[in-house]
Each structure stands twice: as C-alpha cells, then as structure tokens.
C-alpha cells in the first residue's frame, strides 16, 4: 500500500517548522549512516537529539495523531521520532531499502519498521529533481508533493531520491511500527474503514448493515493486531 496524505501540516505550520529547522545545526547525513547507506547517501541531516529536531518532531507527531487518514492507513503502534534531511544541488540518495529495526534516539525504544513516511517541507517549485522514487510490483512511483503533504509506503520497498539540480529539498522522514504487521491485511482494513465511512454518510448511523460491517472490522483488527 502506498498512500498520499494531504495537508498533514498547514502552510502556517510548514512556515513555522521551516523557520526552526533552517536555523538548526545541519551536518553531513552520513554521520548517522551504516556502511551500506553511506555508499548511497549524499545529503544533510539535522542531529536527532537537537532541540530543533525535537521541537518540530513533536509538532509533526501531534499532527499525525490527529489525522484520520494517517491513523486509518497506518494503524500506528509506535511512531519513530521524526528525522529531518535536506538535499542541495548535486545531492541525492541512491537505491536502498530501509533497515528492518530502528532505535528511537529520543526514547531509546526499538521498533520494527513496517511503514516509511516522508513529509515534504519544501514546495515542488522551489527545487528541481529531488523526487522520491518508490519501486513495487507495479513499477516505479515518482513522488514530489506540496509542502505539508506526506507519502506513506511499505518499508520493504526499494526507493531512492533523485539528484537535486536546483534549489533545496527539505523533508521529514520517519518510520511506523503498525498494529498490523502484514501490509495486505493493513490495506484490507483501510479499504473496509473507508467503505464504512462512505456508507455511513448515505444511511442512518444505526443502520444494521453499518453496525455489522463495523463489527467485522473490529473483529479482524482484534484477530490480527499485535499490541
């Protein structure tokens, strides 16, 4: 499942976050890389324990937890503290797959990376290149979204960031351990949740079919969830 989540942050929130981030102590992105990633990555990152990263990360997590589409799609058990990167001219990130297990630098908690998420913090017209390209069974998906929008995709996906040729691409990236480990089951639950919500707008909320479908949804969630 690959899903665009629009307007996670408002434009005012994006401006606030960018003002904080732009003043932060950016470093070579390979400071946080393992051997394999260091050969592929060419970008800058904000130290995960910096005051700026923690401040903006808290804003993002609060916005995510209040976003119905994100919650329905990800069914998050744990959200890794958001990280931040930026790509200037000539920078990119070659094909790679994200690590299966990550340690949260803020809480120290380990989590399984079921879903990866990129939240764009620069407008598409502010830079050339810098597209996120995610590969799945159906081919390559090229992603370049408005500032404040996010893309959610399985962490098993091969992906890369194309070289920036003009301007600067700033984004937040993070991982989610879902209550539902399996992507296919998670996708089915999202489809069912969306269908129930659509039907609820067309019939009475106490309609027997709606109540029955809602019960099926929660019983499947109960059967599949890992808490």
Swiss-Prot record:
Amino-acid positions noted as binding 2-oxoglutarate in the UniProt annotation, renumbered to this chain: 169
Cofactor(s) in the UniProt record: Fe(2+); L-ascorbate
Limits of the Fe2OG dioxygenase domain: 78-178
UniProt keyword Metal-binding present: yes
Enzyme Commission identifier(s): 1.14.11.-
GO MF annotation, one: L-ascorbic acid binding
Cofactor binding annotation: Binds 1 Fe(2+) ion per subunit.
Residues annotated as binding Fe cation: 96, 98, 159
UniProt cross-references to HAMAP family, sorted A to Z: Hydroxyl_YbiX
PANTHER family given in the database record: PKHD-TYPE HYDROXYLASE YBIX (PTHR41536:SF1)
Name of the protein in its database record: PKHD-type hydroxylase CC_0027
Provenance organism: Caulobacter vibrioides (strain ATCC 19089 / CIP 103742 / CB 15) (Caulobacter crescentus)
Phylogenetic lineage: Bacteria, Pseudomonadati, Pseudomonadota, Alphaproteobacteria, Caulobacterales
